[in-house]
Amino acid sequence: MTKEAGRGHALLVGAGILCSRLFGLVRQRVFSHYFGLSDAADIFSAALRVPNFLQNLFGEGVLSASFIPVYARLLAQHKQEDADRLAGAIAAVLALLISVIVALGIWATPSLLWLIAPGYVGEKRELTILIVRILFPGTGILVWSAWCLGILNSHHKFFLSYAAPVVWNLSMILTMLLFRHLAADRLIVYLAWGTVLGCLLQFLVQCGPVLKLVPGMRLRLDLRNVHVRQVGGSFLGVAIGRGVVQISAFVDQAISTLLGSGAIAGMTTASSVNLLPVSLFGMAISASELPTLSRMAGDERDAELAGKLSARLNNGLERIAFFIVPSAMAFFALGNVLVAALYQSGAFTHKDSLYVWAILAGSGVGLLASTFGRLYASTYYALRDTRSPLRFALVRLAFTAMLGLASALLLPKAFGVAQQWGAVGLTASAGVAGWIEFHLLRRKLNSRLGHTGVAWTLMAKLWVSAGVAALAACGVEYALRRQGPIVLALFVLSTYGLAYFACTYVWRIRLCVELVEKLARRMRIG
């Protein structure tokens, strides 16, 4: 497959994710308007993370890494019948597994809450238990959506699977608007039911197109099928690795419940902004590359094949860096403008915007490492190596726990600030752990494929360009400081984006030049 085709697939993934994330930002703005950083916001944010463990453990990332490589190879070999059998068998396994886990999760919710929200007591704890139990079945449905995504992606039908969460977001938005007259503690109960409805709708919009792609599929629990065994072997390793990542997130959440009211809601709000570049550029490129890398993968001892894989990986890393470097710089320098424009409304105050900006800046520390790491992990999965990412994820977990505890609980006291500000240290320390994991992923893959990574000269040019653009944007921010948040953001962020593209074009950075030339051709100038 050509680089142009790969970019086209990444563009489709990015377009789908952009639709989903934009509606996600609208959902978060409506949520922030009604709840701010209140106890109710903390409760729903924490509750949503508990069943999401199930989705992340068995859902999109794990199924993509274990199912797509095997399924895509069968399609490439024109074995449609075998591919259909595999799809049906995996669907049957998921149906059985998820039903059992959802039932156990609902029953064990009180015990789970002691682990991931030890700071919640009394009415706050009881309401969180109720919300978690409502949400669990919906999250099980989302795992089926991930199965749909695996099939659609393998057939290079990228847009629908990543745009489908739009209906999930719409369901939540409409629920909040319809029942906005209720008190916050009652509104979040209705919101939980609206979330479950959204999960069902997200699955249904993908179901029809998927069934057309697998005409011979039958739901059959065929555990003896050799291809099912291959998926199962990879699935276990990836699921454990993904579980480690989720445990890392739960460690952060458990610590944040000890930081006072608003900490979890603040981290969730910052995460909604942080996930936009991660999804648009990191996930889009990694997800679109996995089927192609899987088709290319074979014996990495073959020098020619190793060279092709390395070149493909490096090209993806350069594309990620071009967009993620300015995103991280924006979090550091312009996060206040961004957060205020998105969420400063109703119960969400200017003070809340500054607090979320600080958390967002902390998350910027590991933004590049986490997005690079996704593509490296996809390359390992394409090579059918799930153990290496697992080992490195365990290292990351250990550092996340140690650094997170120290940063969140000890540093605020050392600097004489409120304990709530420990959330900033929590996100920054997670970023440091992410860099350690990325270094380990890269070092081992380099020993197998040869040198990989982005040239330091290119990285330096990108950071300098982002820095110059940030200075220009800060100047505009100062000049227009009396304007409202949305108007201010339009001018400041436009200046930042244009200045960054101008600087990278002056540097003659390949991706920028190609984008400008493509735009010029479409406008029929030059």
Language model: regions and residue ranges:
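Membrane-embedded alpha-helical bundles of multi-pass transporters/translocases
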Residues: M1-G526
